[in-house]
From Swiss-Prot:
Zn finger intervals (C3H1-type): 59-87, 108-136, 153-181, 307-335, 353-381
Chain intervals with Polar residues compositional bias: 290-301
Keywords, in A-Z order: DNA-binding, Metal-binding, Nucleus, Repeat, Zinc, Zinc-finger
A cellular component annotation (GO) from this entry: nucleus
Organism annotation: Oryza sativa subsp. japonica (Rice)
First-listed, main subcellular location of the protein, grouped into a coarse class: nucleus
Single GO MF descriptor: DNA binding
A Pfam family reported for this protein in Swiss-Prot or TrEMBL: zf-CCCH
Record-annotated membrane-spanning stretches: none
Residue ranges, compositional bias (Low complexity): 1-10
Name under which the protein is recorded: Zinc finger CCCH domain-containing protein 6
Cell location: Nucleus
Length: 476
């Protein structure tokens, strides 16, 4: 009967023909389902790979069947037009018997060179690759690596991911070029190193005993008194006069013979100690004298390229620095790289550039997030008042919004029952207090008892919208 025979063939039993008889007509479907050639069934046939290879055609002049090399089976059977070698162990996919490194890649002198093999040293097609795989003294051509361990391939396109992040997930197998950054630090250096006489100091570690460490002397009186934790400041800190959120300002007076020359350095930077007289800071503006030679050296180290046809480097336009250095593909104007020496900074340590355009962000918010690197002007005239003119307790506080027509008070009646009159007008000349109260008194003192500024504004706005002043003695 055919049904028991087919069931026995599907179960793996049978006569060593891979579990399927040619009489049943199920050989092709069973091979497509992966049931053929089951490694030796219960009937002792044990066909395995040998029987499967015996039924599959061998075509020496054709390419090897990749599916057969990987799985040991072929769904097309004897109708497959590729080669099915009996010894699968001698190929790349032969059950892991030989890895890719031990493969002998074919040398085809008349064919083009395998680019993937020349860049990575391996070939994923193995012996089936139709390109030429040259060898140099029996070894693969070496690939140069940069300091980060990524391949340097001159003449190839730069790896965009590496140029943005400094890393490459493909490692040495990446086919693109990974240039050196030329020692440019990944983070821009805003703070220049402290320039002070190098003094050799003893160090507890023997390997660090020969280090030359710059140690600026501590200036007496450079502590901040007050309720905060005492904090020692270096003698190079800029002593700014004027308004400060701290309870007391830094004492700029140097006592004794330890008087040092204090020059203004970059923002929060350390000053340079010299032998000239001490600079006297007067007024809210502080001269910003940066080191010209040091800035020029930094520009020479970075070597920012000028590419007139390319867009401007936005990071360089904002900060004056570029972490990519000479490898940056954008334009870096020379005028921004010129050292800006001798310009002034205001009491907020923001640059004053009289000929430049005012900083719109500073005019709206009162500060600038770019600091001294901002290329725009930060005048103190944009503020409504000088922060250092009056203490906070004596500053006048306006209870009305800007542009609001303040309703003036009529002469108050001696009777406490009568409500005060309010006269609203658009003429600024008449908008003045008609009460005999002095004009220098605060706003709260000219209001009658029981009347608050919020109530005053509400009633004044109501009278303004009604189209005229209230009648004498009238209320609400």
């Amino acid at each position: 009967m055919e049904q028991p025979h087919a069931a026995a063939a599907a179960a793996g039993g049978g006569e060593g023909e891979g579990g399927a008889s040619p009489d049943t007509g199920l050989e092709g479907p069973m091979w497509r389902m992966g049931l053929g050639g089951g490694g030796g069934g219960g009937g002792g046939g044990g066909g395995g790979d040998g029987d499967a290879a015996g039924r599959l055609p061998e075509r020496p002049g054709e390419e090897d069947c990749v599916y057969y090399l990987r799985t040991g089976a072929c769904g097309f059977g004897d109708r497959c037009r590729y080669n099915h070698p009996r010894d699968r162990g001698g190929t790349e996919f032969g059950g892991g018997a030989r890895n890719a490194a031990a493969l002998d890649y074919p040398e085809r002198a008349g064919q083009p060179i395998c680019e993937y093999y020349m860049k990575t040293g391996t070939c994923k097609f193995g012996t089936n690759c139709k390109y030429h795989h040259p060898k140099q003294d029996g070894a693969v051509l070496p690939v140069m690596l940069n300091n980060s361990g990524f391949p340097i391939r001159l003449g190839e396109k730069e790896c965009s991911y590496y140029m943005k992040t400094g890393q490459c997930k493909f490692g040495t197998t990446c086919k693109f070029h990974h240039p050196e950054f030329g020692g440019v630090p990944m983070t821009p250096g805003i703070y220049p190193p402290l320039q002070s006489p190098s003094i050799a100091s003893p160090h507890p570690y023997a390997s660090l005993a020969n280090w030359q460490m710059g140690r600026p002397p501590v200036v007496p009186g450079s502590y901040i008194p007050g309720s905060y934790t005492p904090m020692m400041l270096s003698s190079g800190m800029i002593p700014l006069q004027g308004w400060s959120p701290y309870p007391a300002s830094v004492n700029p007076v140097v006592s004794g013979g330890a008087q040092q020359n204090v020059q203004a350095g970059p923002v929060y930077g350390m000053g340079h100690h010299g032998s000239s007289s001490t600079i006297a800071y007067g007024g809210p503006y502080v001269p910003y004298a940066s080191s010209t030679g040091q800035s020029s050296n930094n520009q020479q180290e970075h070597g920012f390229p000028e590419r007139p046809g390319q867009p401007d480097c936005q990071y360089y336009m904002r900060t004056g620095d570029c972490k990519f250095g000479a490898t940056c593909k954008y334009h870096h104007p020379r005028e921004l790289s010129a050292p800006k020496s001798g310009y002034m900074v205001n009491s907020l340590c923001l640059p004053l550039r009289p000929g430049a355009q005012p900083c719109a962000y500073y005019a709206q918010n009162g500060y600038c997030r770019y600091g001294v690197a901002c290329k725009y002007d930060h005048p103190m005239g944009t503020l409504g008042y000088s922060p250092s003119a009056l203490p906070l307790s004596d500053m006048p506080i306006a209870p009305y919004p800007i542009g609001f027509s303040i309703a003036t008070l009529a002469p108050s009646s001696p009777s406490p029952d009568l409500r005060p009159e309010y006269i609203s007008t658009k003429d600024q000349s008449v908008n003045q207090v008609t009460s005999p109260v002095a004009a220098s008194e605060p706003v709260g003192s000219i209001l009658p008892k029981g009347v608050f500024p919020a109530d005053t504004m509400m009633r004044a706005q109501t009278n303004t919208t009604s189209g005229g002043s209230s009648s004498p003695g009238g209320g609400r």
